[in-house]
């Protein structure tokens, strides 16, 4: 399981400078680098995902279009080391995305090849949200045996020291646009259950 950071939006109806930015339609899996199915991506919201607030939007069945996307986006092959790929503004998939409404605790899962984005809504009804407009956890799941011993060590250190990684749980590297937390000195490592320790990479039988 990935060690992603969270998506946090503050209410912006009365403070426009708080309005978050929408992400462009994109894939997190470059078909030139990782052809075929590799993992399951997901989103776990702690607040309702509504049209007024916005949230994850997906292009249905776009996970089956890797060959077509490669032919239309030559830069994917020219830059095969990059996973995050933005869909061309003129691509026919533009405008095909749909919002997935969710309630707190729902778990949205999708094929890692799926084209998707995070879209900010008008924020009309978020004025009643006293704390946050959106809080969602990105979750990616893949086979543990893909992670090397070095990666497992980095994952353990990340939990101990308060670091987040990209969507790819077996690579343990930073994500696009990652920033350092200003309050890192206040971070305290969590007390994990055995199941949680296994998800990070600990061999609980050896403890």
Summary of predicted features, one role per range:
Residues 108-109, 113-207:
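Non-heme Fe(II)/2-oxoglutarate
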Residues 20-25, 80-96, 121-131, 152-157:
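Short, surface-exposed loop/helix-turn segments at secondary-structure junctions
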Residues 1-58:
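Conserved double-stranded beta-helix
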Residues 36, 101, 131:
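Extracellular/periplasmic catalytic domains that process cell-envelope and extracellular macromolecules
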Residues 33-35, 67, 118, 147:
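Active-site-proximal flexible loops/turns
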Residues 9-11, 59-66, 134-136, 140-146:
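Short edge-strand/loop segments of extracellular domains
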Residues 14-20, 54-56, 68-71, 121-123, ...:
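Short aromatic-enriched loop/helix-cap "lid" or pocket-rim segments at secondary-structure transitions
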Residues 39, 49-117:
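Double-stranded beta-helix
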């Amino acid at each position: 399981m990935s060690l992603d950071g969270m998506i946090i939006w503050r209410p912006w109806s009365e403070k426009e400078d708080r309005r978050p930015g929408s992400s462009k339609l994109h894939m997190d899996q470059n078909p030139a680098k990782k052809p075929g199915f590799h993992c399951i991506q997901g989103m776990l919201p702690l607040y309702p995902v509504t049209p007024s607030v916005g949230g994850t939007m997906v292009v249905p069945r776009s996970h089956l279009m890797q060959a077509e996307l490669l032919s239309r986006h030559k830069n994917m092959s020219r830059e095969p080391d990059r996973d995050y790929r933005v869909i061309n503004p003129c691509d026919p998939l533009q405008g095909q995305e749909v919002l997935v409404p969710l309630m707190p605790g729902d778990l949205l899962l999708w094929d890692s090849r799926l084209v998707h984005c995070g879209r900010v809504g008008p924020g009309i009804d978020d004025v009643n949200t006293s704390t946050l407009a959106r809080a969602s956890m990105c979750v990616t799941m893949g086979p543990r045996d893909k992670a090397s011993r070095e990666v497992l060590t980095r994952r353990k250190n990340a939990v101990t020291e308060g670091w987040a990684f990209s969507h790819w749980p077996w690579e343990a590297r930073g994500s696009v646009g990652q920033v350092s937390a200003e309050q890192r000195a206040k971070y305290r490592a969590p007390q994990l259950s055995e199941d949680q320790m296994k998800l990070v990479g600990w061999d609980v039988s050896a403890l």
